[in-house]
Amino acid sequence: MPEGHSVQRFANDFNKKFKGSVVRVDSPQGRFSSEAKLIDGRILLKAKAIGKQMFLKFDNGLTCRIHLGIYGKWRFTEDLDKLMPGQVRVRFFNEQFLADLRGPTICEVIDQRAVKVIENRLGPDPTNTDPRGLQKQRFIERVSSSASPIGILLMNQEVISGIGNVYRAEILFRAQISPHAPGKSLSVQQIEEIWIDTVKLMKVGVATGFMTTREERLKKRTKKADRNYVYQRQGERCLRCEGIVQIELMATRKLYWCPGCQF
């Protein structure tokens, strides 16, 4: 499933190609036909990402909400005459660009009231600007008030939006914090540092499209196997303490960490 940096990149791409233009919308597959008519021919005001969800706001007060889930994929092209085969749930196009969406978990048209309900439920998104520090404070409050392990909290989209398995493992390794530590056992400084580091790493992800987390690799193009400290490195030596990287299940998801230096 794409993590938040990828969805932010999709939103940025949508704004670049479609914002301010009249957008035609249809459903080649047919499953989105009735909802497509509600926004077909409207002007796209803005594409906005919050965590793993994207919101396409149109000038008639309606918004198309999209969650890719595990199987969803976007395809952007400038070749409007070369339509690729496949089960396209919804197609967005203007005079110059086309975007095909396949296999999303959620694709629906909702009004502004429904958008607000969803936004209020979602946790703060580290890829969005936070000049007053309000999103950081929301994160601190949600973590510090919970007895759940921090490894579970970071995957809870109501605590923080956009983090998946890779960033969860890498952020906690960089912070030298055990994924089993209860949220309320962490100091405010520790929680704040988690937020700051997450913002830093996901900013790199938005810019490059890669989830690179090793400090010495952040400014380089790096092959996939060398981008991370612990993710999918189970059984190998820890790059910090020479311990052995472990893998276990936490709330049905694979967890990678080093017991030797995360406490």
Report residues per predicted region.
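Phosphate/anion-contacting hairpin/loop surfaces
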Residues: 64-162, 167-174
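Short coil/turn linker and secondary-structure boundary residues
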Residues: 2, 39-42, 129-134, 145, ...
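Alpha-helical structural motif
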Residues: 3-6, 10, 118, 135, ...
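Basic, nucleic-acid-binding surfaces and adjacent catalytic neighborhoods in DNA/RNA-processing proteins
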Residues: 22-36, 53, 142-263
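Gly/Gly-Pro- and Ser/Thr-rich, intrinsically disordered tail segments characteristic of DNA damage-repair
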Residues: 1-110
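Glycine-centered flexibility motif
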Residues: 4, 30, 41, 51, ...
